Swiss-Prot record:
It comes from Caldivirga maquilingensis (strain ATCC 700844 / DSM 13496 / JCM 10307 / IC-167). The keyword Protein biosynthesis applies. Coiled coil: none annotated. This is Probable translation initiation factor IF-2. Residues 80-83 are annotated as: G3.
Length: 594
């Protein structure tokens, strides 16, 4: 059965500090302890875990579910680097090279920022995933049983400890429900195609890891079988990383997911400045651990590699290649392959005339993930491209800034901003946001956006007379006229110097000259404040106005219409109430005048 199928590629994702690396290390190290010589093979960026080793390690779980002899999965190719960047680069148009994901969630903390980010990415790339609810050993009162099935460990705990675990799981299940997913503890799942299985694990004690690996084999056979069928022919892969290696020059780490790649083959990948067509001079893979005598001499040369595999490719012109790009082995005319990589890159890059931010990222994969996340947060994108921030990006952002200052910015994810570009940004008044963690970058921008929006709206609102309602406080008449000085309570809205006051019957009272609070002049008094005001105009307290009278700010009609039609959402609820009350009074004055 397994002959025409490759091993599934598995990626580990989740929030920072949830134990992704520790979990991966625990799985790998435990496997090493069970291995026979030559069984575990190290790839570039991937570790191959053969099923026979898993079978030994997870024997009690396999026995419990009577799976002996029923699993045809060869093993798992685990992506060595956990997290978003690696997962983002495991991309191909319309999906992912990863077949399965482990979403690690801290059992004691539940959903966190990057949990949501991971879910958006998994959903968009349509990848089945299993949840490792990690740090079960941190549950108060938990008595660990190293490397045991989580069900055996669970049954060995007292009732109170079991209850604490159930409560933590219930919170995670609730978080999934809020995101539109149905989730359940793995042994209670009734439909794996609809429900998300959760396995409590500990990267420290190894508990739950046997269940996790057996569950992954089951999901592979049930949900991703067709993805694993090998078509054969010329190799197809994705570029994970491009880096300088001592003694080798610029190298390209490739995950080959179909076909064959040979030394001497012509390959096509996408570069920063267009397609790169080159010939493979050399391919290397890591030596088996037991053959690695010298850290400097860690690679073995290979002439041919079959999918699925992780391989380091050495060729000319690789400096320009973009991680996350597709890579194809050329057979015959290279043009169709060139068209394909161009089309692939174009599906990620964006250039429009619309109002939106300029997004820059270091790889095609991270750019794709970035645009996806920005859109999920309701942030429009005008331009998305790879590489350091350039002067051209600043000009593009400044064009947007002139139309909408809130979106005329550059978001730089994991890329450099040259000094001269920073200077240009200062001249053009363009703000650059820079961070290596996507959600923090978006968080910084959103915080600035909201503050800037409030500032701009306040600046716009300052052009209009705002609604206000005051009552003259009995016993607080300091001067009867020329100007009248009285103590007032602001019943709703606000008052400012220069605002005209009217009575409820429409009679003009005068203009507020000054507002004082505890003897000091202030520029604005809001609802709930008691202040002294001086009123200029032909007004005498006791004749034109009396103690206890309610007065209104006389909002000009065009201001009132603008405030209601355009800025209602930005006024406080008491301002809206006073404005509506004032408009009703105003309509009665009009009727009386007729």
């Amino acid at each position: 059965m397994s002959e025409n199928y490759r091993a599934p590629i598995v990626v580990v994702v989740g929030h920072v500090d949830v134990g992704k690396t520790l979990l991966l290390d625990k799985i790998r190290n435990t496997m090493v302890a069970y291995r026979e010589p030559g069984m575990i093979t190290q790839h570039i960026g991937l570790s191959y875990l053969p099923w026979p080793i898993i079978e030994k390690y997870a024997a009690p779980v396999i026995e419990r579910y009577r799976l002996k002899g029923k699993v045809w999965v060869k093993g798992f190719l685990m992506v060595d680097t956990p997290g978003h960047a690696a997962f983002s680069n495991l991309r191909r148009r319309g999906g992912s090279v990863a077949d399965l994901a482990i979403l690690v969630i801290d059992l004691t903390r539940g959903f966190e920022e990057q949990t949501y980010e991971s879910l958006i990415l998994l959903k968009s790339r349509n990848i089945p995933f299993v949840v490792a609810a990690n740090k079960v050993d941190r549950i108060y009162g938990w008595k660990p049983i190293p490397n045991a099935s989580i069900l055996d460990s669970y049954n060995a705990q007292d009732e109170e400890t079991q209850g604490r675990l159930e409560e933590a799981l219930a919170n995670i299940i609730m978080d999934f429900n809020k995101q539109g997913f149905e989730a359940e503890r793995f042994d209670r799942i009734t439909d794996f195609s609809r429900q998300v299985p959760i396995v409590p694990t500990s990267a420290v004690t190894g508990e739950g890891i046997p269940d996790l690996l057996v569950l992954m084999a089951g999901l592979t056979q049930r949900l991703v079988k067709d993805r694993l069928r090998l078509v054969g022919g010329p190799g197809k892969g994705v570029v994970m990383e491009v880096k300088e290696e001592k003694g080798l020059g610029t190298t390209m780490d490739v995950v080959l997911y179909d076909g064959v790649m040979r030394k001497g083959d012509t390959i096509v990948a996408m570069g920063l400045n267009g397609p790169v067509v080159t010939r493979i001079r050399m391919m290397v893979m890591p030596k088996p651990l037991d053959e690695m005598r010298d850290p400097e001499d860690k690679y073995m040369h290979i002439n041919e590699v079959e999918a699925a595999a992780g391989v380091k490719v050495i060729a000319d012109g690789l400096d320009d290649v973009v991680p996350g790009s597709s890579v194809y082995v050329v057979q015959g005319d290279p043009k169709p392959y060139i068209d394909e990589v161009v089309k692939d890159a174009a599906s990620v890059k964006i250039e429009t005339d619309q109002i939106g931010v300029v997004a820059k990222a270091d790889t095609l994969g991270t750019l794709e993930a970035m645009v996806l996340y920005l859109r999920s947060q309701g942030i429009p994108v005008r331009k998305a491209d790879i590489g350091p921030v350039t002067r051209r990006d600043i000009i593009d952002a400044s064009v947007v800034r002139r139309k909408n200052p809130l979106y005329g910015v550059v978001l730089a994810f994991n890329v450099k901003v040259p000094k001269e570009v920073e200077e240009e940004a200062k001249v053009q008044l363009v703000t650059i946001f820079q961070n290596n963690i996507l959600y923090r970058l978006v968080e910084e921008f959103t915080k600035w956006f909201n503050e800037e929006k409030s500032r701009l709206i306040e600046s716009e609102l300052s052009k209009y007379v705002r609604p206000g309602k005051i009552a003259i406080i009995p016993g607080y008449v300091f001067r009867r006229s020329d100007p009248a000085i009285v103590g007032v309570e602001v019943l709703g809205g606000l008052i400012k110097p220069g605002y005209r006051l009217v009575k409820a019957n429409g009679k003009e009272v005068g203009v507020i000259m000054q507002i004082q609070d505890k003897g000091k002049p202030i520029q604005v008094a809001k609802k709930g404040m008691s202040v002294a005001i001086s009123i200029e105009g032909n007004v005498i307290v006791g004749r034109h106005i009396k103690e206890g009278d309610v007065l209104y700010v006389n909002v000009p009609l065009e201001h009132a219409v603008k405030l209601i039609m355009q800025y209602k959402d930005h006024l406080s609820s008491d301002e809206v109430e006073v404005l509506e009350e004032f408009m009703k009074l105003r309509s009665t004055w009009k009727a009386q005048a007729q």
